[in-house]
A protein has these predicted regions:
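Negatively charged
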Residues: 1-116
Length: 116
């Protein structure tokens, strides 16, 4: 899937689980500008960009304060290397494997709470 998603209305969306995870040949090539999405109601981003090997867009302004699961969000997203230092994450959010096998895995400035 690589259709235009830049104008998706996510105002009622609570789960973005697996949205761009290995959904076909083009899944790895996904690299659209989704920085303007309102994800303030999303509670689950588990596996969202898992395997999205080309994705490297600025999503640093997203309001992720409602998210309780970032489980493997960027796992094997081998191009993703954006500044997420302004993300305010909920205490106790599940961040297991959030950056594993991505360029951000060993970058301490991007570590999620509780992963140091």
């Amino acid at each position: 899937f690589n259709g235009d998603v830049t104008t998706w209305d996510l105002s009622s969306c609570s789960s973005m689980t697996n949205v761009f995870k290995h959904t076909g040949v083009d899944a790895g090539r996904f690299n659209q500008d989704i920085g303007g999405w309102d994800v303030s109601y999303v509670t689950n981003m588990g596996n969202m960009f898992y395997g999205a090997t080309d994705f490297n867009r600025d999503i640093g302004d997203w309001n992720v304060s409602s998210v309780t699961s970032f489980y493997y969000t960027f796992y094997t997203a081998s191009s993703f290397n954006q500044d997420l230092s302004d993300w305010v994450m909920k205490d106790g959010a599940d961040v297991r494997g959030m950056y594993d096998d991505s360029p951000m895995e060993n970058n301490n400035s991007y570590k999620a709470p509780g992963t140091f």
